[in-house]
Amino acid sequence: MKRVDTIRPRSRAVRLHVRGLGLPDETAIQLWIVDGRISTEPVAGADTVFDGGWILPGLVDAHCHVGLGKHGNVELDEAIAQAETERDVGALLLRDCGSPTDTRGLDDHEDLPRIIRAGRHLARPKRYIAGFAVELEDESQLPAAVAEQARRGDGWVKLVGDWIDRQIGDLAPLWSDDVLKAAIDTAHAQGARVTAHVFSEDALPGLINAGIDCIEHGTGLTDDTIALMLEHGTALVPTLINLENFPGIADAAGRYPTYAAHMRDLYARGYGRVAAAREAGVPVYAGTDAGSTIEHGRIADEVAALQRIGMTAHEALGAACWDARRWLGRPGLDDRASADLLCYAQDPRQGPGVLQHPDLVILRGRTFGP
C-alpha cells in the first residue's frame, strides 16, 4: 500500500463540532471540541467541521519504532517525518517498542501523535540487529538495565526474547528463567509493563511464567504456551504484516540452514498459531513493526491482516482503536479526553482503502485534512 500524501493543518479553531455515527457503539453522536478537549455537552459558537459519516477515536499502532532506521538511530527530523506519516493515516497513539533515538522532544510538537515509549531494546552481544539494542555483556545485568529503561520509557520495557545464536545455528532464548523473573519483577515494581520480541517456541515459557505482560510476534506459539498466556493474562501483538518478511530472512541465511528452515516453518504456521491464540481468548492488538524494514503508515494493512485470523472487520478495527486504547490506558471519545479522533465519509470497516484515508483527522483539537 502506498504512503498517502501528507495532510496539512486545516484549522486551529478553538471551538469545533462534529456529528456522525460513533464507533464502536454505532450510535449517533455529537461532540464539541474546546481547547483541545472533547465535550459531550453543546458549546456555543462551535464551528461544525464534519457532519455525517463515521467518527472514531484515533487509531493505535501498538508496535512501531519512531526514531529507528535500517541501521539504528536516525536524526530527529527523520523521526518527526515518521510520526507525521502515522498521523496522516490516522494513527494518533503509538506504542514505540524500542528506539535508539531520544524522541522525547517530539512531545512538544502538538501536531504529532502521542508516543508511549519502551526505551531501548535490551539484548545480548550479537544477539539482535546491530545498532538497535543496549547489549548486556552478562545476563545478570538485565534487572538493572530494565530499571533504567523503565525510567527512560513511558511505562513499558522491551526485551529481545530470542534471536539467532550463531554457535548453534538456530533461534534460541537470550535469558535464563530466573533472570527473567527478577527483571520483570523489577519493572513491575516501578509500575512498568514488559514486552518481548519472540519468533520461536523455546523462549515463550520462561517469559510467560516470569509474568511478562505482552508478546510481540508470537509465531512460535504452541497450545501449551497459549494456555500459559491465558493463565497469566498475557497479551499478543502479532505484527502480521511483518510475517511476510520471514521467507526473505530465510533466503538470506544460507550459512545457517537449520535457522532458515525454522523461519520458513514459522512463516507457514504463523497465521494459524496467532488464530489459535485469538480463538482461545488471548487479547490480540494491532501493531505493524514499522521502522527499519516495515514502512510507517501501514496500520490499515495490519487491520486487514487481523481478519485473516478470524476477527470480524469490527473486531480488527477495535484491535487498532478502542480496544487497544483501553489496554494502553488511554481514553477514546470520552468527555474531557484529548480531542484525538478521526472522521470518515464511508465506513472505515470496509477495508484499508477507506481506513487509510480519513477525511478529517483531529489531533489535540487541531484539524488536518486532505
Curated annotation (Swiss-Prot):
**A single Pfam family, by name?**
Amidohydro_1
**SUPFAM superfamilies recorded:** Metallo-dependent hydrolases
Task: Recall the GO molecular function terms of this protein's record.
Answer: hydrolase activity, acting on carbon-nitrogen (but not peptide) bonds
* Protein family membership: Belongs to the metallo-dependent hydrolases superfamily.
Q: What is this protein called?
A: Uncharacterized protein Mb2939c
Question: Source species, please?
Answer: Mycobacterium bovis (strain ATCC BAA-935 / AF2122/97)
